[in-house]
């Protein structure tokens, strides 16, 4: 949209826009010229410099690219057809021993193939609050990609962040808090790339709803993709934050998103690509489109786009033509090719890497070579990951763990396994509220993959019953089942579904709520497990006296049932915490409950205005003093923990803005200078060992009441005490100064809060800068 627009041209565009502002409110705007200039143009596209750890890879890449013909350079920039099951392919250059690239979904496990694992989802890892677990999951999951000949893992996800409660893809990301999301994406990128598989962190940026995410036809008229309209401060403090952590970790590629940003498409937005990503953050890798997200030709390349997937109709020979006629500099094409090849070298894929797509058959149901991606060494991480993402939110009368039950009654559609386990079976053409025919272990769309097996709750419960001599009655289809009055406990299983392509129809469904209430009416010990692909409100029944325990089980992957039984019987102690806020009623989410819809005069150009600024989720609840059902960071354990001994070091006196320095990957290196250290002691005051997530929140002057700025998950034996430490760096303590275009330390008193959740903070203190 903004290609080659100089100051005079920009002034003209702004003048045009000012004229258009007088359009009648009851008539739709019909031309995108109305929006010109709303996303500032940033040109030229900066060349990769090979800074830091990228130096050797860039030296090799420049030498490689210098040997290429113009056509070979162009071929590196767009996907091509190949006889394999990869999501996308880059063609080989045999004369230079470049075998091409296979890129494949997703951040939840390898999609579209066999002999791989279905891992706990991003949301499930977010609920674990475990950085070491996030890294180990990434290492072992990426190893499966490597064995299958996949060069680029299309993940992890930190966009959507989770602004909209009903958004369909929130389950793919970690949390709607940028700090938690950023800490976990750093570990995920670093872990996956440690085994030589490139990550493609996505979806950059502000892809916060599925509704109108792509342009489409409405009554024969084209409707543009939704525009996420945001101010610079909110962009930096919320949505760019986790992408910055991904770049800091060295993410080899970034996927630009379908939506528009300030009315310029994400894959041709020079402000977000050239300005924020490649200049401010010092990104050294390449920018890849989401599938079909290219909406411009040369303008996209000039705006910072490097690779189009799965193919292109507007680049190809047009790139060389553009260079010859001066529309595009030859150096831009060289930089595109160099960034792509440098990432290949950075991952050491030029040596001892399987042939691209070697284990990705084009047709899984036709004869093909068996390539085993799974490894027995992953079993522990699969199970541990599944366990730690469960969050116990209610446990009256110590209903859990179960105590040698003689009779268990199991109810609910979510208890059983699927009738069939097929390739990517759960990509639906619409989004129902629930998956009513089977347990939910993963969401839908490109983030889903094929499990090696599904261990459903009813199967795991019956295995345990066999060992214990417990009788099990079950009815997994009735909405109002009969209940044996002598049963020790009634286990009710429901779910809440979400998928790519559609936003959720709500945060609860009447059928599931009715089932819970019907069972609770007849059973004095009703234990509810919810497999939820996002926020699920429970106000209809959470306070029922017979609902004794509730678990948010999220999306645990293939070891779902096995993990749950470990928790139900106390062999594992719940340690998960909510990575989002559960409201008492959906109205408490305000304007951020539903996705934005087209409205006159923007019926043809849907607008989503991020007017709430940084106040989403718990920040919004804190500002409005709304009592949540279960606050951000909340989660129960079978033991108890006391907090004491808060200590705050003398802060390092620092200038308001970071000292000038050469930009490294991740931005100004002084952003990571430590300013102050906070420590506290945690004592396990219960009778069993457990893990606690100690959370640090900071009240920054002139900012939200409090913001997460540290967390540590520690194992503590019964009666023992351990210390946790939180190092706070410059970025942690800064706000974005729009005028200075810098992170700025605030002068004044910073409040310090340490505790169990965003609302349970027994330790408080302060320091002054």
Curated annotation (Swiss-Prot):
Its main location: secreted. One of its GO terms (molecular function) is beta-galactosidase activity. Belongs to the glycosyl hydrolase 3 family. It is found in: Secreted. This is Probable beta-glucosidase M. GO terms for biological process: cellulose catabolic process; glucan catabolic process. Pathway: Glycan metabolism; cellulose degradation. It holds the Pfam family Glyco_hydro_3_C. Glycans are attached at residues 28, 75, 262, 318, 325, 396, 437, 510, 546, 625. Keywords: Carbohydrate metabolism, Cellulose degradation, Glycoprotein, Glycosidase, Hydrolase, Polysaccharide degradation, Secreted, Signal. It comes from Aspergillus fumigatus (strain ATCC MYA-4609 / CBS 101355 / FGSC A1100 / Af293) (Neosartorya fumigata).
